[in-house]
Amino acid sequence: MTEKLRQILNAIKEFSIKALDGAAPLAKSAAARVPELAGRLFSFAVEWWRFGVGALFAVLVLYYPAGAFFFNRIDVNPAFNDGSKAAVKTADTLAALIGREVDKHAFTPNLPFFYPAAVLDNMPAYQTGVIDGAQKIAAVLAKRNPDAAGLQKAADALAYPATVWHVDDWKPAVSSDKKYRAAAADIAKYAADAANGDQVFDNSSASLKSFAAVLAEQLKSDSDTLAAQIAKGEKRVLDWSADTVFYTVKGRAYVWYLIARDLHSDFETAFLQAGVRKHWEKAVAALKSAVLMQPMVVVNGSPETQFAPNHLLGLGFYLSRAAFALNDLEHAVDAQSDE
């Protein structure tokens, strides 16, 4: 038994010696390859660092700026929908305008940060103003034509906040553009029903006065908004919020212009009177001048300065002229009714 144990121990010893003799070259080989492996790891890290820098460059320089440039569009086409032969042109233009801003152009006020257009500032302000103006006009249409339930429904939908995406406060939500798309459909249906005789449009002098009064009131409110921003700008070297105010008001002014322009088609009888027509032409001309203002950079300089313009002041001037002309139009309609 002792002899067998000795043989086993000797066999283990010989195996261990051979194993160590065989492992020595492997250890030397592994030690020799350590610098090579370290170099490969370093090269791998450098390549990924370069890729990361390139990806960051693509996002910061290409994705956001190029994407924003592609999406950016402040559409102030003065001839928009002017060729419409709809029975109620104001309603037809309003529906088409909402559809244009929501579907044809990207609706930007509610886009989250991962969209390139989310970095835009002026276009969201402009579109917010357009929707706000559209809501005011839809409310007037609903008030003057109470039998058309779709108009009030549209006015309510247009009052929905413009900044809601598909998620709000981490909960699923109805997006702003979906609400506005439904509003445009309701207004378009009313216009189609009026053309077919299934709905009526109040084209009385009282209705024209309502439109003129609301437009004049809104124009004065916009002028006050601009005046308040001008007063703030006098205390600053640079006014970073001036462009937002300018384009929000300009978006509303574009709606006022289109609706004022189309009043002539919807109230033809009233416009046979020269006085009414004269004041309407002044209002439309002033509003057209307002919406065609397109400064490269909005400047809110002091009204007394000789070195910097004040684009808000210029916009307010045209809006005030239009408001006075619409007030005069109201008086002309009254005078016509008294005859």
Role assignments for model-derived ranges:
Residues 82, 107-119, 196-199, 228-241, ...:
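Short, charged/polar, low-complexity loop and linker segments
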Residues 1-29:
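N-terminal targeting leaders characterized by basic, low-complexity, disordered sequences
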Residues 177-293:
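Extended amphipathic alpha-helical interaction segments
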Residues 163, 167-214, 309-333:
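Short, well-ordered, aromatic-rich surface patches in folded extracellular/luminal domains
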Residues 30-44:
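Juxtamembrane low-complexity tails/linkers enriched in Ser/Thr-Pro and polybasic
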Residues 50-66:
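Hydrophobic membrane-insertion alpha-helices, especially the h-region
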Residues 82, 256-339:
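A cross-kingdom marker for long, charged
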Residues 75-176:
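N-terminal Sec/ER secretory leader and immediately downstream segment
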